[in-house]
Amino acid sequence: MQHLNELIEKAKLAIESIQDRSLTALDEIRVEYFGKKGHFTQLMQELRNVSAEERPAMGAKINEAKQAALEFLNAKKTEWEQAELNAKLEKERVDVSLPGRKVETGGLHPVTMTINRVTKFFSELGFSVENGPEIESDYYNFDALNIPKHHPARADHDTFWFNPELLLRTQTSGVQIRTMEKMQPPIRIMAPGRVYRNDYDQTHTPMFHQIELLYVDKKANFTELKGLLHDFLRAFFEEDLQVRFRPSYFPFTEPSAEVDVMGKNGKWLEVLGCGMVHPNVLRNVGIDPNEYSGFAVGMGVERLTMLRYNVTDLRSFFENDLRFLKQFK
């Protein structure tokens, strides 16, 4: 029994002598005394040399001594772990009285803001949004829109072609054709989306956004078109603008016009194109042009955004410069 007490004291002394409360050193002592080859384990193995009558009592004493030493070790381990945690927390302590970090909120891209502004205006007038594929067929992008085979828009330097029949759409007009094929008049839709043209400079990018309008009914006329666009432009720019319609040419409308607004510098600025849907386009989708008429409008979203916010370089919208984008929050 005296030998067991000495072993307990020896274990306690070894634990107390550990420098800097090292948990690694403490674990080494655990292995030395309680491991497979530890002191207490060896004592248990020596019981085989003790007589059967003395073995139970001797085994109980060894277990009691082992438990006392182990409890001392575990108590130290818990104490040191808590001290280590407290030191770590103290080191990482947060001063809750300090002002918090400013969290910046995101905002809509100016192009998205314009799309939302335009679609909101026309949706309140009964126009619904229709979408179509960006990889379009030659038929829907050109043929059905009365664009002749020799038209320059079909050339490789203006259009991104995949093969002789498939291309990246140059306009969202294909959505108008697809809608007229599946719907009967009256039709009142808008088609926002990305379009692609092989051009890149201060006022052109290879990809840009367009919104087209289509209205088909028995009484659609140019006077109604003019009134609609007057109201839209004044609402969009929030000014009582001067608006003028200039005769123009588009293969898919007849008559056709380009629409200008008077800028602050006293000069006319082109904002969109429009016209009455060409009878051939109506025939291509099975609508009788003798019974129905319609008008169409096409506007470049980036163009409208540049004019509304006085942006001079179209490419700024696609450079993701936060210094530029923050101005539109």
UniProtKB/Swiss-Prot annotation:
Known catalytic reactions: tRNA(Phe) + L-phenylalanine + ATP = L-phenylalanyl-tRNA(Phe) + AMP + diphosphate + H(+)
Name of the protein this chain belongs to: Phenylalanine--tRNA ligase alpha subunit
Entry annotated with the keyword Aminoacyl-tRNA synthetase: yes
GO biological process: phenylalanyl-tRNA aminoacylation
InterPro entries: aa-tRNA-synth_II (IPR006195), aa-tRNA-synth_II/BPL/LPL (IPR045864), Phe-tRNA-synth_IIc_asu (IPR004529), Phe-tRNA_ligase_II_N (IPR004188), Phe_tRNA_ligase_alpha1_bac (IPR022911), Phenylalanyl-tRNA_Synthase (IPR002319), tRNA-bd_arm (IPR010978)
Family classification: Belongs to the class-II aminoacyl-tRNA synthetase family. Phe-tRNA synthetase alpha subunit type 1 subfamily.
The organism's place on the tree of life at top rank: Bacteria
Key word Cytoplasm present: yes
Cofactor mode of binding and number, as noted: Binds 2 magnesium ions per tetramer.
Originating gene: pheS
Alphabetically ordered keywords of this record: Aminoacyl-tRNA synthetase, ATP-binding, Cytoplasm, Ligase, Magnesium, Metal-binding, Nucleotide-binding, Protein biosynthesis
Cofactor(s) needed for function: Mg(2+)
EC number(s) recorded for this UniProt protein: 6.1.1.20
Taxonomic path: Bacteria, Pseudomonadati, Pseudomonadota, Gammaproteobacteria, Pasteurellales
Annotated GO MF terms: ATP binding; magnesium ion binding; phenylalanine-tRNA ligase activity; tRNA binding
TM region(s), chain numbering: none
Known partners and oligomeric status: Tetramer of two alpha and two beta subunits.
Localisation: Cytoplasm
Binding site for Mg(2+): 254
Species per Swiss-Prot/TrEMBL record: Haemophilus influenzae (strain PittEE)
GO cellular component: cytoplasm
Gene3D superfamilies: Bira Bifunctional Protein, Domain 2 (3.30.930.10)
Primary location group: cytoplasm
